[in-house]
């Protein structure tokens, strides 16, 4: 029961947003969220583009400049920054689209690519964070027995696997192209135009919900629970400040994960059930549409949170930053430290 024109972005049709022309049944809902949508998206995507680009560019530059300090988590951080940069480079196109009140100006190829890039970033970020959490758990809970699992080479293979998996599983979104509406305006990021496509979107939703959110979220919770229990158990044996720092890092990472991804996936599921119910009051539908805009903006904002994750992931990145600054100021060649023993490696990984 939407008025024609209350359309949402293509990411929102993962929420089951219906074709507004075919769903105009009794014409009882005369309100739209177009103005709200255009203002929020254009503002949020502008901020995310600027902050995400400079933040991730800086982190990536520092990590590459200190690449001689080899670390498995450095590999994950670099890949996470690359995924963020690929996404934020497409967000200005979305800003232009919403500033022009839903008129696409950049051709069919960029329409497909912009839609695709946001999905790839969303789930690459989730999987990279999950991989980092898993291997951090291995390093802290089993620091000596399983130290060979947490290597730079294995991290590269994991990252390659994540890229291939996400790129292939997100490829269906490349099939959704721009089109001309009844006013001859080119549209992009809009809901599917037939019932068959809507069913396909429903299937994609549950597949991505289970494999792209539930499994990674459970993995992170289990890993961080094991880490916290291990750190608390060993508090009296080793340096308490370093243990508090590790626990604080876990809290920051978990909070960022929950703020960025959980609201979007929960809202998307609720929205699907609402749209498939027989009774859909106009005010409830409009509130749900507004919540789509808010939660989708939060999901996209993970590009801004990730640089903070790099900083709060422990002393290692801050040490890299200090090394980079000293190297830049003194123009002296950095001399790497001697190879660490297994216990030292385990402790270093705990501080990543």
From Swiss-Prot:
GO terms for cellular component: plasma membrane. Residues 1-43, 94-121, 178-208, 267-291 are extracellular. Disulfide bonds join 111-188. InterPro entries: CLT1_recept (IPR013310), Cyst_leuk_rcpt (IPR004071), GPCR_Rhodpsn (IPR000276), GPCR_Rhodpsn_7TM (IPR017452). Widely expressed, with higher expression in the lung and skin, intermediate levels in the heart, kidney and stomach and lower levels in several other tissues. Isoform 1 is the most abundant form in all tested tissues. GO terms for biological process: calcium ion transport; cell surface receptor signaling pathway; cellular response to hypoxia; chemotaxis; establishment of localization in cell; inflammatory response to antigenic stimulus; positive regulation of angiogenesis; positive regulation of glial cell proliferation. Residues 65-72, 143-156, 230-245, 313-352 are cytoplasmic. It is found in: Cell membrane. It comes from the Eukaryota. CDD domains: 7tmA_CysLTR1. Glycans are attached at residues 15, 19, 26, 184. Keywords: Cell membrane, Disulfide bond, G-protein coupled receptor, Glycoprotein, Membrane, Receptor, Transducer, Transmembrane, Transmembrane helix. It is a multi-pass membrane protein. The chain crosses the membrane at residues 44-64, 73-93, 122-142, 157-177, 209-229, 246-266, 292-312. Pfam families: 7tm_1. One of its GO terms (molecular function) is leukotriene receptor activity. Receptor for cysteinyl leukotrienes mediating constriction of the microvascular smooth muscle during an inflammatory response. This response is mediated via a G-protein that activates a phosphatidylinositol-calcium second messenger system. The rank order of affinities for the leukotrienes is LTD4 >> LTE4 = LTC4 >> LTB4. MK-571, a selective antagonist, was shown to inhibit eosinophilia, bronchial hyperreactivity and microvascular leakage. Zafirlukast (Accolate) and pranlukast (Onon) were also shown to be selective antagonists. Belongs to the G-protein coupled receptor 1 family. This is Cysteinyl leukotriene receptor 1.
